[in-house]
Amino acid sequence: MKQKRIWTLAATLTFAGLTMLTSCSNEDNGIVYPTPTPEKPAEPSQVKPDYLKAGDKVALISPSYYTPMENVEKTAEVLRGWGLEPVIGPNVGKVVDGRYAGTVAERVSDIRWAMGDPSVKAIICNRGGYGTIQLIDHLSLAELKASPKWLVGFSDISTLHGLATRAGVMSIHGTMSSFLAKGGTDATSTLMRDLLLGNVPRYELPAHEQNIEGQASGVLVGGNLCTFVPNLGSQADATQGNDLILFVEEVGESMHNIDRQMRILQMNGVLNRCKGVILGEFADCGTEFTYGSVEAMLHEMLKEYGIPVLCGFPGGHGDVNLPLVMGAPVTIDVRADGATLQFNIDGTQCEVRTADITATVTPAAARMVMAGKHE
């Protein structure tokens, strides 16, 4: 592979008299800055929301489980440090039935509040857990498409990504207040920030023993396996299209339940519509079978389809959760020496070497709590 020249990509933003430096992070995080080259634009059927600029408003909402207001306020401070203006949903901070961040009506109301305010340019969810499936029938695809803006989150927020994709709007599978509140200076946070500002990652991944080689292009769908599979057949089901690149991650699930969910996708014809598969983190998942890993088990299932499989993408509930643009046209290239994931959308392309990115280890118990699988 040719050596690429390293550039320091920086954009100077001035907001409220403060000059800020925004970039795709730094070389220590394993990020290389090549000369920007225009990429093939997104297909007309999928709208890419406008990238953010200094002073733009970002709404913080809680569509699933509640998040302590302390975390929300710390996240707001992080956003201010990025030169953005945070606004907090009217119902954020409420607790219903011991877990939910408000009633169904209140959580839907906060989504509509954020979507309907033209001054809000992005929406960051505070936490996953459980609850977005309760909102599916209370939202319409038309209202999501009427005001396209970046929706950010993962885990239970996979349901909202499915709704956004079905509405024809791209969204970001990325970190939330439960993580941003730690300071927002790690690679997981800064790459998500940079993506919101128009710096699009092009991921270079190391070789993985369970990879299946090949190249494929399609629309990126998926997320947390046990969240999006129950949405099959609903208006939040983004797997109904063709030419899919399926992303899957999980936390705290047994191997047999992961197999069950994948079999459901198989029986519903989803895997037949996939051009490729990306396997993310399977954090704290079971090892009750003799495969050795979840990836090894899924390799055996997916090898029958003759499609490329990219294993080990650091996205999901692991120690690193790198951002993905859901609903975007992407290309994966899986080779013997590694793999590449590229988003075919406009923006400044930034090469990210995932093997060089490190983060503070999140204890397994903390990951399970954030996923809503433990108290």
Segments (PLM) and residue ranges:
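ATP/nucleoside-binding phosphotransfer catalytic cores, i.e., glycine-rich phosphate-binding loops
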Residues: C285-E375
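ATP/NTP phosphate-donor binding region
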Residues: P36-S119
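Internal helical hairpin/lid segments
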Residues: T239-V294
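Conserved anion/nucleotide-ligand pocket segment
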Residues: M170-G233
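C-terminal motif of bacterial Sec signal peptides marking the signal peptidase cleavage site
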Residues: M20-S23
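Bacterial lipoprotein signal-peptidase II cleavage site
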Residues: S25-V32
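Bacterial N-terminal signal peptides that target proteins for export
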Residues: M1-A11
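Short, acidic/small-residue loops that bind anionic groups at enzyme active sites
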Residues: L139-L163, M170-M176, Y305-P308
